[in-house]
Each structure stands twice: as structure tokens, then as C-alpha cells.
Amino acid sequence: MRKIVHVDMDAFYASVEQRDDPSLRGKPVVVAWRGARSVVCAASYEARTFGIRSAMPAVRAERLCPDAVFVPPDFARYKAVSRQVREIFHRHTDLVEPLSLDEAYLDVTEAKTGMQLATEIAQLIRTQIREETQLTASAGIAPNKFLAKIASDWRKPDGQFVIAPSRVDAFLLPLPVNRIPGVGKVMDGKLAALGIVTVSDLRLRPLEELQAHFGSFGQSLYRRARGIDERPVEPDQEVQSVSSEDTFSEDLALDALDPHIQRLAEKTWHATRRTERIGRTVVLKLKTSNFRILTRSYTPEQPPASLQGLVDIALGLTRRVELPPETRYRLVGVGLSGFSDPELQAAVQGELFGEVPQQ
């Protein structure tokens, strides 16, 4: 039986800012640029009490908490701390799969230290993070990645939770189905319309029914409802693409997609920074009301060097959609692919990761 730990830093960017600037401690801190198109990169726990969340438009965050302190992101500093944390991970196992600057999966089935109990390994890792970075982390311990990720949220902040193999069903079945990664607001509504509210409800549905309604995602739902996840922890997994997408509650015309494309471009921009990689190809994804999927892409000579550059390319790709004007769209996505190692493009990285996005 595998022993998987998911470690997630607590309000990472905001916590780094509060650590480095004592005047911010105890205050609602929002890591974001101000501006109509800006989105929240991170919110301190004080800010979260006002309903502020990551990826929320910054203007909405400002309305929710006018007294919030807005701090522009400093990704170079966050990356430096992330490297410290990853060094701690590697003391315990070489099987470390970073998901972003602030979270990773670890397979500690055969830990370097010889420690046998995954709970003790997770506790030691969290203690070392606290002592060496003055930051806190939460951890989930389980037999697979899916369960470990859910567990890491259970005792946030600064806690850990274990799902033992013998307790998987007792833990999983009562959960609302939206705790399954990938089940967002729209999917949650579709499942509820079928009478599926909890994981227990989901488990009662046959695979064929779920596939009929949700295609390949139906198979994923079927497996997750049974706590099945055989994906290995893949060390130093290279990011192939980064994207953000939205499914609408009502289908929209093409010319109504611009504000959504702008917001998704910013989410993708920030997500790219967290991966520490550079994407060159801009991809626009659309799904029509009759579920036809279209993608349009453009590869400039150099990667987009600013947020506005990414937005402009993504918006320009809508002009390459040659469908009747009455066509309606139920989903839009913006992505970056064609990633290169930043060390091979140091000059580009300096521009890409060092500049302040245009507002």
C-alpha cells in the first residue's frame, strides 16, 4: 500500500508578505495588482473571512473588503521560498511532484530517513518548514493522490489529516460531490439535477450512465467515488501546458466572450508564473451549445512578454472562429503551451517574470 502525502502551504503568497512585513500581520492582505482586469493571486486568512478568494476579480475583492491591503506579487521571492520548501521535501524522498510553487505530492512509501509512519513524516516536514521558513503548511496523508489532496484541506491552516485505507469509505461517502477535484459549480449543478449530491449518491450510479452524461469525465467520477486513483507521484513532472476555462450557466454569443477571455488570460498568466516555465503558444478553446469543441492557437516568435500581450493574442484568436454569428458558446478557455526551460531563455524569463502587468 502506497503512502502519499500532499503538502500545501497555507495562503502562501500572502503569508510570505506578512512574514516579511510585520505591519501586515493580522490584516486582510490581498496579493494582486489593482486594476479592472486584475485577479487575486492569494488572500490571507484575515481577508478570506470577508469572502475574498484566489482568482476572484480584484475589483470584487476591493468591494468585499475596502480596508484590505493590496500587495503586488513578488514571484522572485515566492520562488526562493518554494525552493527552500522543496529542499525539505527531498530530504525525505526523491519522489516529489510539484504542482505549483506552494504544493506538491510526495510518495513516502520508502522514505530516505527510514521512518515508517507517513503521519510522522508529514509532521516532521511541517515542523521543518515552520522552523526554516517561518511559514506554515498543511498536509494530507492517504493511499493515493486524490485522497491525499482532499485530506490536506481538512485541517487547514497548519494541520494535517490522515485517511487510512480502512477508513476510505467512511470518509469519502458522506462528502458532497463537489469535493471531488474537477467538480466545479456547473458540474455540481448537473450532478444535482440527476439527484447526485453526495459521493454516496455518485457511487450508486453505473459507469455507463455516468459516461453517457459526462463522457470520459464520467469514468473519472466513477473511480473517484470508489476512492480509486492509481496515478504515480511523478518527480519533476514537466508542465506541458497551463490553461483556465469557464463553463457558463447560459450560452453566450462570441462577442460576449471578451471579458471572460481577459479574465481567463490573467488566471493563466499567474498560473504560468507559479510553474516557473515559459509558454510560447497561446490557445483559445471554445465549446458550442451543441458540444462541438474548437481550438485556435498562435505561436509568436517570442513568448508573450506581458499580460496584455497574452490578452491581445487570445482576443485576436476569436477572429479566426468561422462559425455562423448565431452560434452560442457554453465554454471558453485560454491556455499556454510549448513550454521551455526558463534557464534556456534567461533573457525572456527576466522580462516575463520581472515586469508588472499592464492594467
Curated annotation (Swiss-Prot):
Task: Please list every transmembrane segment annotated in the UniProt record, as residue ranges.
Answer: none
| Catalytic activity, EC | 2.7.7.7
Q: Where is the signal peptide?
A: none
Principal subcellular localisation of the protein: cytoplasm
**Record keyword Transferase present:** yes
**Subunit info?**
Monomer.
Name of the protein in question: DNA polymerase IV
Origin organism is Xanthomonas campestris pv. campestris (strain ATCC 33913 / DSM 3586 / NCPPB 528 / LMG 568 / P 25)
